[in-house]
Amino acid sequence: MKITSVKAYQVDLPYVGGTYYWGKGNAIRVAPTTVMVVETDAGLSGCGESCPIGGNYLAAYPEGVIPALARLAPAVIGQDPRHIHRIERLMDEALTGHPYAKTAIDAAC
């Protein structure tokens, strides 16, 4: 089995409680999320997601997920998604850091 494509979809997920608050008066009503779909030549697909909520909470921004995935996708296409340690190594070689983007592919595999 080999990965044939990596697709990303952006969606704003509303908080069930209305507003999410954290330190320094920060609040958001939706979580900007990227849903990742990894497709294989066996007709199987896997899904993962990345939902960073900004630099006041984590060192990650939702706007950075798609560009990071553009660097990561070519590294994993053609690979067997069941060999997750190899996938992780290839992602690390393709892009330093950005675990918030790598986790979506990791979960999808």
Predicted regions and their residues:
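Structured beta-strand/loop patches that form or line metal/cofactor-binding pockets in enzymes
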Residues: 1-47, 51-56
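Metal- or metallocofactor-binding catalytic centers and their adjacent structured scaffolds
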Residues: 5, 39-109
